[in-house]
Amino acid sequence: MKILAFSDVHGSEKALKRIKQKLAHEKIDLLICAGDITIFEQGYVGIVRKLDEFGIKTLIIHGNHESRETMKRLAENSKNLIFIHKDPVRIGDYVFYGYGGGGFSFREPDFVKDSKKFLSFVKRGDKIVLVTHAPPYNTKLDMLWEDHHCGNKDIKTFIDKVNPVLAVSGHIHENAYVTYHHKKTILLNPGPTGTVVKI
């Protein structure tokens, strides 16, 4: 499966144009958005409309610049957007699990609780793709400067325990476009213009 993931667009027309160009030049099966498509919900409806007009299935979560309720409502009223915050989606033998918002705490008790419920949804042989706005702690995705990590420890614990094939996150703009392997997982901050990844 070929995925084009993106995060932290923050209303940028240039970023949306680059995503559209990548869709035109690559055979993409799925779009994934890890949140913050706006600056505090400015121009929300228009941005969601543009994403919908890409005409490809798009799994999306809210970031810290959007409310869960508004993102869910706009996705439900679109043709191609699927809101996956705490609502996993199965595509073939892949299961996509999203958890939006946050990005400012080391711990997320609600994520711990919900991720346990998610694991009861998973079947033997499923390949898990995790989509969060907050990056996992102590990785190349949450480093602000040398030896200073600001990510979420509960998300990191989940990744270490479950070994998803891919974990997409955003929030930390300084680490946009960073991709690397952590054990069995591809960790990715896809940046606002997007990164193509094959799983």
Where do the PLM segments sit?
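Active-site-proximal beta-strand elements of phosphoester/diester hydrolases
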Residues: 1-10, 93-102, 129-133, 186-191
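Conserved acidic residues
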Residues: 29-31, 57, 126-129, 165
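Divalent metal-coordination and catalytic microenvironments
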Residues: 8, 31, 36, 63, ...
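Core catalytic region of metal-dependent phosphoesterases/phosphodiesterases
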Residues: 6, 11-91, 190-193
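Short, solvent-exposed loop/turn segments at secondary-structure junctions
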Residues: 40-41, 138-140, 176
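Short, conserved loop/helix-junction motifs that constitute active-site signature segments
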Residues: 50-55, 122-124, 159-162, 182
